[in-house]
């Protein structure tokens, strides 16, 4: 299946052709006839761990927020808590991390809502009846939003090789328990003939 890919040139002869202006215009084009006035728009992105630089910068996110507002939407930035221990495993630390990396109402023009609540236990269960899952868990604020818009950076991933848009939605929109369900497929497969019973694996 082929995807439509848009390219924004960095070349600009004046302010109206800047990358930021072009990003806002592209957002308007992509949302035209999809977004309804008054929609609560979840802008799903990754805020990064404190000091990490693998995230989309707030100045770019602000262009998307402004475009959504100009089209009558009510945007909020969101992500779900992580499964692993770190600075994004609960909503308080997650918000602190977002602020540390430059995300705040004053920098992006939209509130930040951690999608699965303080401890990662606010979710809705949805029946899908597919091969690997009969039911899935979706972070509550993602489920409750009228519209989902994702902003994704590409990164390396230990289990899949590459993480991007599918991971941002599939794993990133799941509460902690939903992430556990997805990671349940990754189980150790020790060679029993080499096992010495040390319990390290």
What is the role of each PLM region?
Residues 1-200:
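N-terminal and secondary-structure boundary signal
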